[in-house]
Amino acid sequence: MAVVALNKENFKDTIVNNPFVIVDFWAPWCEPCVSFTPIFEAAAAANPDILFGMVDTEASPEIAEYFEVGKIPGILIIREQAGIHAQQGEIGAPALDKLIEWAREFDMKQVREYYAEQDAKK
């Protein structure tokens, strides 16, 4: 699957409509970000069941601010609309592959229970 450009117009719908999303926060002036792009694109091609999206922090700073991204590149993994991992700083292909494997195996049971409890309180 191709990497999707995420912005304030499509971010929420993307998260709501896709059960597994990995977001790369980047900027065009950031050399480590630009170097990471082919790694991120290769991971997207190797994992077509996951939506991979990129947020340009210059064009969409409000998204980066909302998720408190203080350093780029940054990765955010979202499953079932819940952020399960955030990482800031450079990451190579082997580490990204391990992170994806971890996210696939992450047990969402406690997350679901937490949100069910929160909904019940409303």
Q: Which residue stretches match the model-derived regions?
A:
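Thiol-based oxidoreductase modules, predominantly thioredoxin-like and allied folds used
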Residues: 4-6, 25, 36-62, 69
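Substrate-binding pocket helix/loop in short-chain dehydrogenase/reductase
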Residues: 11
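Short active-site neighborhood of thiol/selenol oxidoreductases, capturing the structured segment around
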Residues: 16-28
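Short cysteine clusters
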Residues: 30-33
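Non-catalytic, surface beta->alpha helical segment in thiol-disulfide oxidoreductase systems
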Residues: 71, 76-111
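CheY-like receiver
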Residues: 108-122
